[in-house]
UniProtKB/Swiss-Prot annotation:
Gene3D superfamilies: DNA mismatch repair MutH/Restriction endonuclease, type II. This is DNA mismatch repair protein MutH. The keyword DNA-binding does not apply. It is found in: Cytoplasm. One of its GO terms (biological process) is mismatch repair. Belongs to the MutH family. GO terms for molecular function: DNA binding; endonuclease activity. Keywords: Cytoplasm, DNA damage, DNA repair, Endonuclease, Hydrolase, Nuclease. It comes from Shewanella woodyi (strain ATCC 51908 / MS32). It comes from the Bacteria. Sequence-specific endonuclease that cleaves unmethylated GATC sequences. It is involved in DNA mismatch repair.
Length: 231
């Protein structure tokens, strides 16, 4: 099994990501001696782990950007035949206790989304996992409007948590960012702030980017790319 080194510069990272574009997951897996699963029902994190390995990501599941020394978070994003994201994008686990003094600027969500390297990957279920193609990379930094929307949603969600109302939050809350249960199963529980400042047990929660938001990122990036190459 090969172990690629972590890129020292953004240019090196992007060069490696561009070299990967056009390959299938099976081809990439074979190059590292990985076994490609027949489906992803029991291996939901396999694609992300494969791409992380190829690009030399270091963070793993730690609450920091994947390429901390470059300030870049890596996100694989499955898309359908029309280029639309198939699912929401997980960002990080949500803090449910000890949140006094926490601000958007000091939050893990803010840090992880400062600069994101998006890797689109064919996600249609009728395409065998080994034959799904890796798309062109997108290096994205949120603009002022996107940052404002993210901050607004994060602050509203954290207010619910601080008031002990985490159980009232649904995936419908938030324009671009949502809070959803995050755990291996519904039996996973953790502490959270309860009514009147008490402590209660609840399912772990995670922050996710909504599909229309990630769709706008992809559309804008590939729209610019198309214009640039059609001159």
């Amino acid at each position: 099994m090969t172990t690629p080194h972590s890129p020292k510069t953004i240019d090196e990272l992007m060069s490696r990501a561009n070299d990967m574009a056009g390959l299938t997951l099976g081809q990439l897996a074979d190059s590292h001696g990985f076994i490609t699963p027949a489906n992803l029902k029991r291996d939901k994190g396999w694609v992300g782990q494969l791409i992380e390995h190829e690009l030399g990501a270091l963070a793993g599941s730690r609450p920091e950007p994947d390429f901390l020394h470059l300030g870049i978070e890596l996100k694989t994003i499955p898309v359908d035949k029309n280029g639309k994201p198939i699912e929401t994008t997980y960002v990080t686990v949500a803090p449910l206790i000890d949140i006094q003094g926490l601000t958007w600027e000091t939050s893990v969500v803010c840090h992880k989304l400062q600069t994101v390297l998006w890797i689109p990957i064919q996600g249609d279920r009728d395409i065998p996992v080994s034959q799904r193609q890796i798309g062109s990379p997108i290096l994205w930094r949120p603009n002022e409007e996107e940052l404002a929307l993210l901050k607004q949603d994060w602050e509203e969600i954290m207010e619910f948590i601080a008031l002990g109302q985490v159980k009232q939050l649904t995936a419908r809350h938030g324009e671009v960012l949502q809070l959803r249960p995050k755990g291996a199963n519904s039996r996973s529980v953790t502490q959270s702030i309860g009514p009147n400042g008490s402590t209660q047990m609840t399912n772990p929660r995670g922050f996710y980017l909504k599909i229309p938001f990630t769709q706008s990122i992809l559309s804008r990036a590939f729209g610019i790319y198309t214009q640039a190459t059609s001159r």
